[in-house]
Amino acid sequence: QYFPIKTGFMKTTPLKAVDGVSFSIKPGETTTVDLVMRESKDDIQVIGNFNSESTYKPMDSDELKSILATTGRGYYIVAVLGAGQEPTNHALRDIAALGKDFDEWGRGIVLLFPNEEQYKKFRPQEFPGLPATITYGIDVDGSIQKQIAEGMKLSNKTILPMFIIGDTFNRVVFVSQGYTIGLGEQLMKVIHKL
């Protein structure tokens, strides 16, 4: 009797990258089979999930609003920032440097702060060129930060900033946490493959 093993990963397209092998097991013996996981260097891969119905408090409203209601259907960027912290400042400078590219992409970017005090420390004028598609808000109870950390299996749940590119099918195709060199370029590289 033969047994199949199938391995692979889900892509953002209907195609899936799958490998398979069949093997047999003889009574009283141990059978060792190599487990081969395909990896694509070029394709965008689904690396986790994030609920696009998650809510936050927009800075221009007292009502909670979902990421989906803010960005519409399709891909979006969500980040939880630490205002005045160098890793966040560096990330925002990287994004501002490519602000026109993000504006051309035209998708929503939701930048969240852990609380009102953090938002009050934020000085957008220090980052000229930030995309016009940004919506600022508060991660009211820390649920979005927690969801990103858990959904992406981040080893440290408190290091900011946290960035994801996700879609409204709740798939995540990019994650970054903490100090990252060239974050704007990394985001655009993924965006161009979507």
PLM-predicted stretches and their roles:
Residues G74-Y76, A83-L130, G142-Q147:
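Structural microenvironment flanking redox-active thiols in thiol-disulfide oxidoreductases
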Residues F3-D34:
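Structured interaction patches on ligand/partner-binding surfaces of diverse proteins
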Residues S24-L64, Q186-H192:
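Pro/Ala/Gly-rich low-complexity, hydrophilic intrinsically disordered segments
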Residues P131-T135, E150-I164:
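Structural micro-motif
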